[in-house]
Amino acid sequence: MILTSVLGSGPRSWSSLWPLLGSSLSLRARSTSATDTHHVELARERSKTVTSFYNQSAIDVAAEKPSVRLTPTMMLYSGRSQDGSHLLKSGRYLQQELPVRIAHRIKGFRSLPFIIGCNPTILHVHELYIRAFQKLTDFPPIKDQADEAQYCQLVRQLLDDHKDVVTLLAEGLRESRKHIQDEKLVRYFLDKTLTSRLGIRMLATHHLALHEDKPDFVGIICTRLSPKKIIEKWVDFARRLCEHKYGNAPRVRINGHVAARFPFIPMPLDYILPELLKNAMRATMESHLDTPYNVPDVVITIANNDIDLIIRISDRGGGIAHKDLDRVMDYHFTTAEASTQDPRINPLFGHLDMHSGGQSGPMHGFGFGLPTSRAYAEYLGGSLQLQSLQGIGTDVYLRLRHIDGREESFRI
């Protein structure tokens, strides 16, 4: 490939290399199929946006600012005001904070090896962030409730524009997998991009939800969350998927602190739980293909204390092979990794791309489910760990720190 031979696959100076993109892609287009030519044209068009804003001083200045992360307690006790001043305060915080966080992600896209950044799908996501930065910084300062209402419309639009970013990143990296030489660099990029996206969506959705008067909720924070109820919701969802795929699904038993209730943010659980449950059910069904209507139960244990919430999901799906155990929490997008048959690494019916509001989007099979869940848990001050009993099954431990516990909570 022309770009590979000229530019290589290592990091380069994007500001000096972007002018080469048009001519390089033109040469490449001569030897590609009609589909590839279409992709080249898309890349050329999208590069115009990236090129025109690449040296924009506003992005550079914002990227040097630190983000101001809030604790859920700050969000919970910021209070409601009769005159709506809490909405103005929240909106002004977002107006200051979102451009900074988005500028950080644009800087992250610049750090990618040039040949990966030229991928049309990756370029499209890069462009989405630049356009979002432009729209947010073009919005005038929020002075009154009318301004805040218009700002909410912009935030809703941007949330919708970015709803497929996880899927697009997975597609782009799989398309670019032969150019990935430093997987640690790409994994760091993904961890930062995906967790930043989660934080942005949580803050934005929280602000929008402050306009609603929903029982037991302050914004996106549920003041009396029941782990058992949210688990049951996603058990029903995962069982329907499993029944559609295999004709049956394991039963699920929930034990432990089933009566626990406490303030918490459901959104991370809405992202993580479907993935873990789907994996457990799939592993169970795949390891009992000879007896699909007589499979072991999946057992979920809830442990609640004054520091954190622990959810253990135990399946009898045969466990994870020793050779795969060290890699199961990694993002899988290379050719060699795509050939594995382990359910958690190369799923037959994909991984969930969860959108804002806790609704499940389309399924995608790029091996992003577990590593994304792990990154989310760590971002929220917790962890996601697996214990495999090869030949028996797997226990998955999800720990999430309380927002009102004895120790300091996480920051969003």
Swiss-Prot record:
InterPro entries: AK/P_DHK_N_sf, BCDHK/PDK_N, BCKD/PDK, HATPase_C_sf, His_kinase_dom, Sig_transdc_His_kin-like_C. The modification Phosphoserine is found at S31, S52, S356, S360. The keyword Transmembrane does not apply. The modification N6-acetyllysine is found at K192, K233. The keyword Transit peptide applies. It catalyses: L-seryl-[3-methyl-2-oxobutanoate dehydrogenase] + ATP = O-phospho-L-seryl-[3-methyl-2-oxobutanoate dehydrogenase] + ADP + H(+); L-seryl-[protein] + ATP = O-phospho-L-seryl-[protein] + ADP + H(+). Its EC number is 2.7.11.1, 2.7.11.4. Mg(2+) binds at N279. One of its GO terms (biological process) is isoleucine catabolic process. Residues 1-30 form a transit peptide. Serine/threonine-protein kinase component of macronutrients metabolism. Forms a functional kinase and phosphatase pair with PPM1K, serving as a metabolic regulatory node that coordinates branched-chain amino acids (BCAAs) with glucose and lipid metabolism via two distinct phosphoprotein targets: mitochondrial BCKDHA subunit of the branched-chain alpha-ketoacid dehydrogenase (BCKDH) complex and cytosolic ACLY, a lipogenic enzyme of Krebs cycle. This is Branched-chain alpha-ketoacid dehydrogenase kinase. The lineage of its organism: Eukaryota, Metazoa, Chordata, Craniata, Vertebrata.
